[in-house]
Amino acid sequence: MEIERINEDTIKFYISYLDLEERGFNQEDVWYDREKSEELFWDMMDELKYEEEFSPEGPLWIQVQALKHGLEVFVTKATIGGKGEDGFDVTLSSPDELAEEKIEKLLEENFNPVKKEALGEDDTLEFILEFRDFEDAISLSRATGLENLVTKLYSYQGKYYLNVEFPENKYDESNIDNAVSILLEYGLESNLTGYMLAEYGKVIFDVPALKQIRKHF
């Protein structure tokens, strides 16, 4: 498992599916077994205690994302009047004292995937592309087949990232695969999320980013 300190208030975990299996879990356990999900979460927090100076006490905001080869988990300390309204109190040293409804909230809102058949028309798939440099973003803006993509360009920690959204009512799997294959000719798939970029990055070009880049460069 990899642990990365994003900033003073946010920690990112990345755990591969192979690592999950070595720890005695499988993907179905994590998504659908509440006790297994809870066990994995506390294992991660225990490991964090020894590797980073990050106290998980108090309200936390947790985001879990399923990637192709593993899970990415962001744990952010909530602040009063901010994310604290949506967070919940966690005390690492005594998880058994947590209220049952708080554990269920964690598992239901963050560890349970939404089934495709339950998705509404407004649901959107997200892809984050990391550019090696800005010239690659300019080159991508001139590529064909991407004219109607919903894109936003961010700068974050000295790098450029393109947030691409695929509304599920407009794109099927084949369309998405074709678009992603073109995108990957100009950059790399990033483990960052749209939330992280919106929260901590700087918007360089808002929607539609590629059209604006092509216009100005």
Swiss-Prot record:
Xref: InterPro entries: MecA_C_sf, Neg-reg_MecA
Molecular-function annotations in GO: protein-macromolecule adaptor activity
Domain of life from the UniProt record: Bacteria
Subunit (UniProt): Homodimer.
HAMAP family in UniProt: MecA
Domain notes from UniProt: The N-terminal domain probably binds unfolded/aggregated proteins; the C-terminal domain interacts with ClpC.
Family: Belongs to the MecA family.
Function: Enables the recognition and targeting of unfolded and aggregated proteins to the ClpC protease or to other proteins involved in proteolysis.
Cross-referenced NCBIfam families: PRK02315.1-5 (NF002644)
Alphabetical list of PANTHER family matching this protein: ADAPTER PROTEIN MECA, ADAPTER PROTEIN MECA 1
The protein, known as: Adapter protein MecA
